[in-house]
Amino acid sequence: MVVLDNYYSNRNNYSKVNVIDKENRKEMEKLIKLRSVRLTEPLTEKSRPSSFDEIIGQKEGVKALKAAICGPNPQHVIIYGPPGVGKTAAARLVLEYAKSMENSPFKKEAKFVEIDATTLRFDERGIADPLIGSVHDPIYQGAGSLGVAGIPQPKPGAVTKAHGGVLFIDEIGELHPIELNKLLKVLEDRKVFLDSSYYSSEDPNMPTYIKEIFDNGLPADFRLIGATTRNPDEIIPAIRSRCVEVFFRGLKPNEIKEIAKEAINKVGLKVSDNGLNIISRFCSNGREVVNLIQLCSGIAINEERNYITEEDIKWVIENGQYTEVEEKKVSKKPIVGVVNGLAVYGANLGILMEIEVTARKMKGRKGELKVSGIVEEEEFSMNNKKIKRKSTAFSSIQNVLTALNNIYNLKCDEYDIHINIPGGIPVDGPSAGIAIATAIYSAILNKPVNNKIAMTGEISLLGMVGVIGGVNAKILAAKSAGANKVIIPSGNWNENFLNYKGIKVIPVSNIKEVFNLSILNIEKSDINILSAKTNKK
């Protein structure tokens, strides 16, 4: 009987091995066949930057990234910027550049591990966590090779795989708060501690390496590079405080043209300068450019042409429902009640914001104030409470009216005043204070404003000009829009502003200085207007 039992047991084992072997050969043949089939390389791959010189328009951002990663003490980094401007490409290149530096701690074998926060999922039971790591659970996931013996099986996550290198988390702003808190702990400890109810330090059957992992943790000494399209204030302060913040800006039309030209050259086609101009008007980032050119090149190749026509570009734009990127420019001549304000949107992108005001003297009744184009109310949560208040932009307008009354005795409530900020994007923030004050002052006194001056700054009830944020981006936006002077708060002044070419940066501390610089046909001496009525022509 024993002989028969052994015979049938060996026969069954042989049959199982034979079946597994046949299945293995069959699947390997399928896999080899699949791998032998390859399509042509897409243009998105061909046009991907292979060196920092190919990252267009991000000279300052790349310089900051190199300074943070390529020194003897590399830092954790968060890169802010709009989509398709080179954040991911720069992150991929910076590790290879750091390896070439003599004083860099990154070894030649240092790995670049990339993970996308938008698709990152984890299990609350701790049995699946591709970022931090997990422990195989024999109940939920099957026994596995060691599960029969009751031995837990640790699975390293991305933080351990990136040990000694760089962990790149794309769209880090979308990372789940629980995962983010786990990541913060790993950044502090530089190791990962796992836990399992199956682990016992007294178990003599426990393999040494598993005991070492549970007792002393998995190594996770890496440098984090996160990329996000969110604003800094939308990122949890705990992660921001541990990282150097690097900003990539939006691309200018001439930079879009350069990217388009390079992409077209890589597919072996030609295009006219006017065609490049059209592309630069309808694309705002490199990804949009490449997608548009892929379709245009497809049309040209199907029609057996070696060039892309303007009609090809226009057809793709029309069918792809591309929206023209409006480039804000200063007005051609001074206008009463129209002022060039400045704002910041997205990730440190500056924009010229035309503010227009009309004022009409009322008789027999009080005037009315109308405001359009701004956020009037805002709601936010704080300490488990929902708080609703007037927006900072609307409050800034109230400050302006009070300041004009206090300083110049302008009775704004005697006028029907309409303040409008065109553009279709609701505006918030106090930094348009001096621009709104100048526009109201101009409209009431019927005096034009210098159209070549742009301005930004908060205004107090006493007419003092307060500091604001995003000054560098605003100055560049003013220059790009055609302004030759930009007024900023004196508290934001930096000696580096003297190095800007093509635009003069003027610091001011009170609203009188602003009016003296911007209102045309106005005496340069101290102004003491007693009544708006007596001064209006």
Task: List where the protein language model places each region.
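Pre-Walker A (pre-P-loop) alpha-helix and adjacent loop at the N terminus of AAA/AAA+ ATPase modules
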Residues: V37-Y80, V400-N405
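Walker A/P-loop
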Residues: I69-L120
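AAA+/P-loop NTPase substrate/partner-engagement loops
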Residues: S100-S134, I139, S201-D203
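Conserved C-terminal "switch" segment of AAA+ ATPases
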Residues: M101-K107, P232-A238, E245-Y307, I407-E414, ...
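Conserved AAA+/SF3 P-loop NTPase catalytic/coupling segment centered on the Walker-B
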Residues: F122-I132, P154-E188, D195, P232-S241
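Conserved catalytic/switch belt of AAA+ P-loop NTPases
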Residues: H136, Y140, I178-G217, P237-A238
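Conserved C-terminal helix/linker of AAA+ ATPases
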Residues: I293-Q294, I299-K329
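Peripheral, non-AAA+ core regions of ATP-driven protein-machinery
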Residues: V339, K361-K537
